Amino acid sequence: MQSLGRHVLAEIYGCRFEVLNDVKKVEDIMVNAALEAGAEIREFVFHKFSPQGVSGVVVISESHLAIHTWPELGYAALDVFTCGDRVNPWDACNYVAEMFSAGDMKASEVKRGLMEQPEERLVANM
């Protein structure tokens, strides 16, 4: 079965407070993560919460990267969804974890838009 895209959900632990709480640093890291993965950036928006935390999204031609940080816990939730075969979402995840000086990253990949091939559909419907 063919998929339309790859969606990596990453739990990033042991990150530096000062990075996770700096909206400009998080924005720069996420934009560079998209570029490192070979994506084409369309636009991005990031928000700094009070007293701490950052959320943001980078819209790419191939889909998106999204992040939510909990600096007080040294934790970030990262979401990287890419369509097609040109961009590797794992490259973006690994880049972010490295730039956050993460102690650990646990991640899983989900295939999105699983599509049956026409010949598979015909056989399945008989």
Swiss-Prot record:
Q: Do you know which SUPFAM superfamilies this protein is assigned to?
A: S-adenosylmethionine decarboxylase
Quote the cofactor binding remark.
Binds 1 pyruvoyl group covalently per subunit.
Which reactions are catalysed by this chain? S-adenosyl-L-methionine + H(+) = S-adenosyl 3-(methylsulfanyl)propylamine + CO2
Q: Which family is this protein grouped under? A: Belongs to the prokaryotic AdoMetDC family. Type 1 subfamily.
The name under which this protein is listed is S-adenosylmethionine decarboxylase proenzyme
Gene giving rise to this polypeptide: speH
- List, alphabetically, the InterPro entries matched: AdoMetDC_C, AdoMetDC_fam_prok, AdoMetDC_N, S-AdoMet_deCO2ase_core, S-AdoMet_deCOase_pro-enz
- Reply yes or no: does the keyword Lyase apply: yes
- Give the superkingdom in one word: Bacteria
Q: Does the keyword S-adenosyl-L-methionine apply?
A: yes
Positions bearing Pyruvic acid (Ser): S63
Pathway field of the UniProt record reads: Amine and polyamine biosynthesis; S-adenosylmethioninamine biosynthesis; S-adenosylmethioninamine from S-adenosyl-L-methionine: step 1/1
Organism the protein comes from? Syntrophomonas wolfei subsp. wolfei (strain DSM 2245B / Goettingen)
**Biological process according to GO:** spermidine biosynthetic process
